[in-house]
UniProtKB/Swiss-Prot annotation:
GO-annotated biological processes: translation
The family this protein is said to belong to: Belongs to the bacterial ribosomal protein bL27 family.
Signal peptide region: none
Keywords: Ribonucleoprotein, Ribosomal protein
GO MF annotations, alphabetized: structural constituent of ribosome
Pfam families named among the record's database cross-references: Ribosomal_L27
Top-level lineage group: Bacteria
A GO CC term attached to the entry: cytosolic large ribosomal subunit
Protein name, entry field: Large ribosomal subunit protein bL27
Gene field: rpmA
Amino acid sequence: MAHKKGASSSRNGRDSAAQRLGVKRFGGQVVKAGEILVRQRGTHFHPGVNVGRGGDDTLFATAPGAVEFGTKRGRKYVNIVRVTRAEA
């Protein structure tokens, strides 16, 4: 049984701020060491070559280079491949 507040309740109207998760640097982009590549909850993407994983599962570049996404044994990986001056 409802007890008053039939139309629109003043008890509503709250929401949490978005977590801003997702891929921050896409395939082919050139990054510097320390740049965040993916913000995630859990390991949707796994760290590959020259990529580190933070305590909150954030993936970051450990060396400069180009971002490369790939799959290995059913897992998605993020790698950083070194680029020469001519390619960059």
